[in-house]
């Protein structure tokens, strides 16, 4: 039977519930337990797919094609369980499902209410998402006291009663601020946060005390006394220089022992040697490179969370400190390519819309003409094709129909038909809704022997995740290939271009898929590892 650890946050947002939850999950997995994780988001959007990156950050795409919260990326980087559409749901998704059932008459004319209908649907999805895991960690987004979170908190209160205390526990993250002028930490915010939880029938079993200073033993004793939590379950979690230290920090304080004993689980001790190696490689690099990352959402770097982590993983794999130079593509439009000078490689990530695209195209041209290693992802591949068409082919009006529907040379256009991961045919047109209408999820890709990308993966066929609705225009592709554009990756049916390279360039690879979604700190990712190696070669050459 599955045991549940419900994770809530108090006092302020952005305390790191996702990282703390994933770190505990990693320790439990290291003890031989089967672990999964869920994220419950209180916002009313059906999913984050149409939300602004400036508001929500990255949209993480699962293997089965769900557009989900970026915390699922943390989950997959810390544990080896692959997330699915069942591991993340929102208030909007819950209400959509309940209202659809009401319209069908499934409730037999009953008055639909938050309790029991909404809370029952939340509980049903938690149980379904947990599956057959030994332990499921369920993170509730937002902060205790938010009106949006109330149905979720009520649902977990009910579920705790239904499954019993031997199968459910509550872990609460809270802020313990350090007052520099007084030279001490303050426990009052934590006391009030727990008081808020207890007022709705939820008693925490574990408190994770976030602070920029260690929470000393006397403060932990005081917190335990006022919150009715065992002193050994009051955990100090201060800021660290790498998040991959956190499993070790929690393990050193006995959190996993407490959980295992509380649930009555029989399992081995935790082997965290893999995490020790990750931390050692991260903190003791032997090399250093600078990579210019040219994007359009630089005001909120969470928009590129998985990509930034993937570059860190590539650094770990190569024992290299990767310095990312964040450059807004609009700044290149206004200030020119001087912003790129001195970079050992250039990375252009995905994005949507016209703003900043010309700056990205200029960055591609700089990389191609100056033989600087280049990696383009999603839109980064599309702008690479546009740049090639304009500056090698001489098609000065070349563009994507996303940006110019009247382009005389639309080298990138809307995908109107493709097969999804199950083999079912998907069709789209310009009038399709924005939400949930992209080519999403894992797709097989055939790689050309002898190509740079094949050298990285060492395979003929790979599987990577996608999130796009535009592709290279096959009608103009033969002319691009004749001029020297190398198509080194195609969809399984050969219909869609997945990877392009530049002939006569030391390392120029652009892919339509998002390899960052499958990169992990323990295993890295072959494409990013190859990119960092190319950057090292470029630096050594200089």
From Swiss-Prot:
Residues 1-265 are annotated as: Amidoligase domain. Mg(2+) binds at residues 71, 139. CTP binds at residues 13, 146-148, 186-191, 222. Residues 290-541 form the Glutamine amidotransferase type-1 domain. CDD domains: CTPS_N, GATase1_CTP_Synthase. It catalyses: UTP + L-glutamine + ATP + H2O = CTP + L-glutamate + ADP + phosphate + 2 H(+); L-glutamine + H2O = L-glutamate + NH4(+); UTP + NH4(+) + ATP = CTP + ADP + phosphate + 2 H(+). This is CTP synthase.
């Amino acid at each position: 039977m599955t045991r549940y650890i419900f994770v809530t946050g108090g006092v302020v947002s952005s305390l790191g519930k996702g990282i703390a939850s994933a770190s505990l999950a990693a320790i439990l997995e290291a003890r031989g337990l089967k672990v999964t994780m869920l994220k419950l988001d209180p916002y009313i959007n059906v999913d984050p797919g149409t939300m602004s990156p400036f508001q929500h950050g990255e949209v993480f795409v699962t293997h089965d094609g769900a557009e989900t919260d970026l915390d699922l990326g943390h989950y997959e980087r810390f544990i080896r369980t692959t997330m699915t559409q069942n591991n993340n749901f929102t208030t909007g998704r819950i209400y959509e499902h309940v209202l659809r059932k009401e319209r069908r008459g499934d409730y037999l004319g009953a008055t639909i209410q938050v309790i029991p209908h909404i809370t029952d649907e939340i509980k049903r999805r938690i149980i379904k998402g947990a599956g057959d895991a030994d332990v499921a960690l369920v993170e509730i987004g937002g902060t205790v006291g938010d009106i949006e979170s109330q149905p979720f908190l009520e649902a977990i209160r009910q579920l705790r009663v239904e499954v019993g205390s031997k199968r459910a526990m509550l872990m609460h993250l809270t802020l313990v601020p350090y007052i520099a002028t007084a030279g001490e930490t303050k426990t009052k915010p934590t006391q009030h946060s727990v008081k808020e939880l207890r007022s709705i029938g939820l008693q925490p079993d574990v408190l994770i005390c976030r602070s920029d200073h260690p929470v000393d033993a006397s403060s932990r004793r005081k917190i335990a006394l006022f919150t009715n939590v065992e002193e050994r379950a009051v955990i100090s979690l201060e800021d660290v220089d790498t998040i991959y230290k956190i499993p070790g920090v929690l393990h050193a304080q006995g959190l996993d022992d407490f959980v295992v004993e509380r649930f009555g689980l029989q399992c081995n001790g935790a082997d965290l040697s893999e995490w020790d190696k990750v931390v050692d490689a991260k903190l003791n690099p032997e090399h250093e490179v600078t990579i210019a990352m040219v994007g359009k959402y630089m005001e909120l770097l969470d928009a590129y969370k998985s990509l930034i982590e993937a570059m860190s993983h590539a650094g770990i794999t190569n024992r290299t400190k990767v310095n990312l130079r964040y450059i807004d593509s609009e700044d290149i439009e206004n200030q020119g390519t001087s912003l790129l000078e001195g970079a050992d490689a250039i990375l252009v990530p995905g994005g949507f819309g016209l703003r900043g695209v010309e700056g990205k195209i200029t960055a591609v041209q700089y990389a191609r003409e100056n033989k600087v290693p280049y990696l383009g992802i999603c839109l980064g591949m599309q702008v690479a094709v546009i740049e090639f068409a304009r500056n090698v082919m001489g098609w000065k009006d070349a563009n994507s129909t996303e940006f110019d529907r009247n382009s005389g040379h639309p080298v990138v256009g809307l995908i109107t038909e493709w097969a999804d991961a199950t083999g079912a045919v998907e069709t789209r047109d310009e009038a399709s809704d924005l939400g949930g209408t992209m080519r999403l999820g894992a797709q097989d890709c055939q790689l050309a022997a002898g190509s740079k990308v094949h050298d990285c993966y060492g395979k003929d066929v790979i599987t990577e995740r996608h999130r796009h609705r535009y592709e290279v225009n096959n009608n103009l592709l033969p002319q691009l290939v004749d001029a020297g554009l190398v198509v080194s990756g195609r969809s399984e049916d050969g219909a869609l271009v997945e990877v392009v390279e530049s002939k006569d360039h030391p390392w120029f690879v652009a892919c339509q898929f998002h390899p960052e979604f499958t990169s992990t700190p323990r295993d890295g990712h072959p494409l990013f590892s190859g990119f960092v190696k190319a950057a090292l070669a470029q630096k050594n050459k200089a």
